[in-house]
């Protein structure tokens, strides 16, 4: 059965317009995660940033954006790694249907 979403070999969508919440849920489940309300806040923030600037933010910028828009409780590396243990910028962008950030942890 063919992949229902156009992805590259690393699992990132090759067409950001093909993203939907089911894509995020299925990718997270494949990584052993269940997306919480906090995850969705980050994913929505990333998609908004991408829509406005045409790029996925690297880790430092992601942390700053989360702090500014969602508060310091989520806007720190420890909280972001708790949500996205394999690397917040990398995992969150994958689930959000965005390209892998150029410089991500």
Regions found by a protein language model. Name each.
Residues 33, 40-45:
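Acidic, aromatic-enriched beta-alpha/helix-loop junctions
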Residues 34, 52-58, 80:
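Short acidic, glycine/proline-enriched loop segments that cap or flank alpha-helices
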């Amino acid at each position: 059965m063919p992949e229902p979403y156009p992805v590259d070999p690393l699992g990132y969508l090759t067409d950001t317009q093909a993203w939907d919440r089911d894509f995020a849920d299925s990718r997270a489940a494949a990584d052993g995660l269940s997306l919480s309300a906090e995850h969705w806040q980050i994913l929505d923030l990333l998609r908004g940033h991408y829509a406005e600037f045409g790029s996925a933010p690297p880790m430092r910028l992601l942390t700053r954006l989360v702090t500014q828009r969602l508060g310091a409780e989520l806007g720190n590396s420890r909280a972001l790694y708790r949500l996205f243990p394999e690397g917040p910028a990398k995992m969150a962008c994958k689930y959000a249907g965005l390209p892998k950030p150029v410089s991500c942890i």
